């Protein structure tokens, strides 16, 4: 006898992070900044005090309180998770019946569709326009006409870096009866959050993370914020001890220090501006087709040389992310990293241009 895998398991397509060791990593939208020496010393002291023989606080009270204080939301409306991915999985498995339809947009974070394959829910996908904008009227009409139960999207968007303004998001929430899962992983880089309004809606869950602006990707710490009813359901549905004690303590330390973000945010935004302006210059020179507006810590570039550029950079120890044959996503790094990636790409494309006209 042998175990026969079900079709769902056979057809799973896992998330495909870039593997290998590279000198410059601009592929995962991580922060290029590390905590200061004093911050690291404080973190070390906290780790020394962790009771490793005890299970963590199941509701991460101190962590949720720190998040609530920083962002001005009631901690009772916050659910902590082992990264936002865990919370997406909990949301899908909890709020969807078998057969319920999920709506996504494209391009967007690929894991949304992955989780629909796990829960075996039909998934509709609407394409964004040439400017990588969501057609709000189309979204609302599709939810109504197709009986969509859950609509999930990132704002600002990963991978396009384009954001949808607050009023447009409000329309989707107010004019439909679907559960709206609003992934604000990159909202620390923009100013259109709906966190301050979340308690007013019975069909909204907002996701946030410590991995981007806060630079704590290694901790795997995310949050779901919703009204009291939805939060009670999320807390009941998640695993009992889902966020380990080290993550709870260290993330709470960072969230409790407003100076941490106040110091790092201008540096990250300056890096993003430098990188975007560099690609805008390449666009003006006719070397890339388009660089999209950015509300995140990365830039999204359209070029028919995407595959060649990625390989050219790899050969020089630099890794970026490619989407299909025509798009690149480049994380903002240090000034030196930004300058190097811009110089290498410009060198390659100018050389090709010269060769064509030789």
Give residue spans per PLM region.
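PLP-dependent aminotransferase class I/II
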Residues: 36, 203-281, 291
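N-terminal "arm"/small-domain region of PLP-dependent enzymes with the aminotransferase-like
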Residues: 1-54, 147
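Conserved N-terminal alpha-helix of the aminotransferase class I/II PLP-enzyme fold
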Residues: 41, 45-83, 271-274
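Active-site phosphate-binding strand-loop segment of PLP-dependent enzymes
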Residues: 130-188
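PLP-dependent aminotransferase-like
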Residues: 5, 94-153
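PLP-dependent enzyme catalytic core of the Aspartate aminotransferase-like
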Residues: 167, 307, 312-316, 321-358
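Conserved PLP-binding catalytic core of the aspartate aminotransferase-like
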Residues: 269, 282-316, 332
């Amino acid at each position: 006898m042998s175990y026969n895998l079900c079709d769902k398991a056979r057809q799973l397509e896992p998330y495909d992070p870039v593997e290998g060791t590279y000198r410059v990593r601009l592929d995962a939208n991580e922060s290029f900044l590390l905590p200061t020496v004093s911050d690291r010393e404080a973190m070390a002291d906290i780790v020394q005090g962790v009771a490793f023989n005890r299970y963590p606080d199941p509701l991460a009270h101190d962590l949720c309180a720190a998040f609530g204080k920083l962002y001005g939301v009631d901690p009772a409306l916050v659910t902590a998770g082992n990264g936002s991915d865990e919370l997406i999985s909990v949301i899908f498995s909890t709020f969807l019946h078998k057969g319920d339809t999920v709506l996504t947009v494209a391009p967007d974070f690929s894991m949304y569709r992955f989780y629909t394959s796990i829960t075996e829910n039909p998934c509709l996908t609407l394409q964004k326009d040439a400017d990588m904008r969501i057609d709000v009227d189309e979204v609302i009409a599709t939810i109504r006409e197709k009986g969509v139960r859950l609509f999930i999207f990132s704002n600002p968007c990963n991978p396009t870096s384009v954001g949808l303004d607050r009023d447009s998001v409000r329309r989707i929430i107010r004019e439909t009866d679907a559960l709206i899962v609003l992934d604000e992983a990159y909202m620390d880089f923009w100013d259109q959050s709906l966190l301050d309004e979340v308690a007013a809606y019975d069909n909204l869950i907002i996701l946030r993370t410590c991995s981007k602006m806060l630079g704590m990707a290694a901790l795997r710490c995310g949050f779901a914020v919703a009204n009291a009813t939805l939060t009670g359901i999320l807390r009941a549905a998640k695993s009992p001890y889902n966020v380990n004690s080290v993550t709870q303590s260290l993330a709470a330390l960072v969230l409790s220090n407003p100076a941490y973000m106040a110091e790092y945010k201008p540096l990250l935004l300056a890096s993003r501006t430098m990188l975007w302006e560099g690609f805008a210059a390449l666009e003006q020179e006719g070397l890339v087709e388009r660089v999209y507006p950015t509300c995140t810590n990365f830039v999204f570039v359209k070029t028919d040389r995407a595959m060649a550029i990625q390989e050219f950079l790899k050969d020089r120890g630099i890794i970026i992310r490619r989407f299909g044959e025509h798009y690149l996503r480049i994380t903002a790094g240090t000034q030196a990293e930004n300058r190097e990636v811009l110089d290498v790409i410009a060198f390659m494309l100018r050389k090709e241009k010269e060769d064509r006209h030789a």
